[in-house]
Amino acid sequence: MNFEIQAHRGARGIGPRNTLESFRRALAAGVTNLELDVGLSRDGVVIVSHERAATRLECTGAHVGKLWKDLELDQIRTLERGTGDRFTTLDEVLQLVQPHGVGLVIEAKVDPLRPNETAPAAELAQRIVDTVEARGLVSRCVVQSFDWRVIVESRWLCPELRTTALATQSTVRPGSAWTAGLPVRSRNPFNGELVALAFLAGAHAIGPHHHGVNPKLIREAHAAAMRVLPWTVNRRWTMHALIDLGVDGIVTDRPGRLRDVLAVRDFELPLPVADEFARAA
């Protein structure tokens, strides 16, 4: 498998995050995967957004301040984003990538500490799986989350669907509600326990913050046939350092910058899908 260039939130460094415009720009830059965040509307549509609600940072309209789970898609479509884009759906992004061979990394935004602010983890996982299966794109999609209940549920619903266990020092620690009931014993799981826990959750890869990546973590992950995909990396020297450590891919807001780093190291690069926005990368 080639080194992964994951365009974070549709490469938010070169376009408005989590919009069809940013996804098109990332495709034009040449990436292996688009990464995006999703939640669930009241009528069961998987929508693309990093937030739990319509916020003034992202949009204006009558429904600002309301949770996605309390709004239907028609109401969400009335929100103005100021970019010419409306909020998009997972299915629309799947349609965008379907002809091009690019993968999709779908982050389920749920929070076990705020269960009343999003749809239940199991329901969101079910809707994601249903949407991906309906497009016949299971082999090109990955589901990931900091809330590992999504990982467990996704694997149960669709065993062939790949998953990534996202992790930070605050979500993987003793007493954590984020690890799907798996007990964390170490106060520094990035030095030994993280890989075993993610493996038990059924993950195919781990997604640590790049500050948590270390040689032991990578050795243990590779010994378990798991990939290491750190986020979110935008500085060239950090990209070089992580590649030297042996990571399997990088999540970045600047895919063009990562391509430059990989090119000088003679990595095989994915072909751009189009060149309309390539200069912006």
Where do the language-model regions lie?
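Phosphate-group recognition and catalysis centered on beta-loop-alpha active-site segments
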Residues: M1-A281
